[in-house]
Amino acid sequence: MADAPTFNAQPCDIITQLVLGPVSPRVRNARQASADRWMEIETILHESTRHDGVAPFSEQFLRGMEEPDLNHWHALVRVDGHVRGIAAVDPSGPAVELAVHPSYRRGGLATALQRAVRAHASSLGLGDERDIHTNGIGLTWWAHGDLPPARAAAEHIGATADRELLVMELPGSVVKDESDNNPVAQAAATLPDDVTVLSWTESARRWGKDAVDAAWLAVNNEAFDWHPEQGGWDQARLDQARRASWYDPDGVLLLWGSEGDQKDGDTDSLPPLLGFHWTKLAREGDDETGRKVGEVYVIGLARKAQGRGLGRASTAKGIQYLASNDAAYVELYVEADNAPAVHAYEALGFTVVERHTAWKF
């Protein structure tokens, strides 16, 4: 722990550690935060969400606090002995997210956390700490909601906007509309007759889990060879993603082509996988009282399947699956500069509700 420096006349000190460990205060060891510290961290995240109208940490960073094998690194900033801010580094990006309690903002705590992250950069192989103030360190800082304080903090340290991610939402009135005039139903009806949609569970039962996973990974990596987070997956990365508490194999919809004999158990007759729609269904809040929220989590198409309207049809099929499982509404994330995708989602009834900015520093 460093001596207590002063940033903008607000005394604070920084604690850094490799892994916080499980959020539950009942499960602790030497590498994990104390129960009191966890309560303070959870308070920061809760109050930030309530104040800003958007959560400061994405799912990957929340998992990084619970799962040591993700190897996330954390810095905590304390004022008067209490944690008032947290920064997290995901080495796979590398990417950063941070949060400061709303009552302690504009006091230099975000700057203190950013300095701690900069000091950690050399251990990630991102350059010498003495040079990073002028040359940058190659980290991506995600500012959720693109709020003015975050934008000001980013500009203060010389960061530049690199990506913008839109959150789009389909209201419950559209999700639950079963009429033929529903744009979702109309899009689902365009699925070609020679394409069969099966869940991962159904597919694995027919052709074996290993063959299905291999086909899924091949399409994923072909579809996202350009993507910094979704591309280049292997079996270990897929297994890691499936450890999320909300994961349901029935919610992974796979689009199979018509070639090949589809006898049960005959893995040699695996037909070509044209694409997939990985849906997500979770609850708002931290308990079972919140509404179910559906998400168009990942959609990927093989190159040979592109240009056939399968993206639109598979999106609609996934929304129908989420609706059948009582989703109150459906959301998705899309790159702001992907105009064709944004227009396609708008045609289904989605509207933009949030903007998230990735800053390079």
From Swiss-Prot:
1D-myo-inositol 2-(L-cysteinylamino)-2-deoxy-alpha-D-glucopyranoside binds at residues 59, 229, 280, 295, 333. Acetyl-CoA 2 binds at residues 299-301, 306-312, 338-343. Acetyl-CoA 1 binds at residues 98-100. Its EC number is 2.3.1.189. Residues 25-173, 195-361 form the N-acetyltransferase domain. The keyword Acyltransferase applies. CDD domains: NAT_SF. Pfam families: Acetyltransf_1. Gene3D superfamilies: 3.40.630.30. It catalyses: 1D-myo-inositol 2-(L-cysteinylamino)-2-deoxy-alpha-D-glucopyranoside + acetyl-CoA = mycothiol + CoA + H(+). GO terms for biological process: mycothiol biosynthetic process. GO terms for molecular function: mycothiol synthase activity; protein-N-terminal-alanine acetyltransferase activity. Keywords: Acyltransferase, Repeat, Transferase. InterPro entries: Acyl_CoA_acyltransferase, GNAT_dom, MshD_Acetyltransferase, Mycothiol_AcTrfase. The keyword Thylakoid does not apply. Catalyzes the transfer of acetyl from acetyl-CoA to desacetylmycothiol (Cys-GlcN-Ins) to form mycothiol. Belongs to the acetyltransferase family. MshD subfamily. HAMAP family: MshD. Monomer. This is Mycothiol acetyltransferase. It comes from Corynebacterium kroppenstedtii (strain DSM 44385 / JCM 11950 / CIP 105744 / CCUG 35717). The lineage of its organism: Bacteria, Bacillati, Actinomycetota, Actinomycetes, Mycobacteriales.
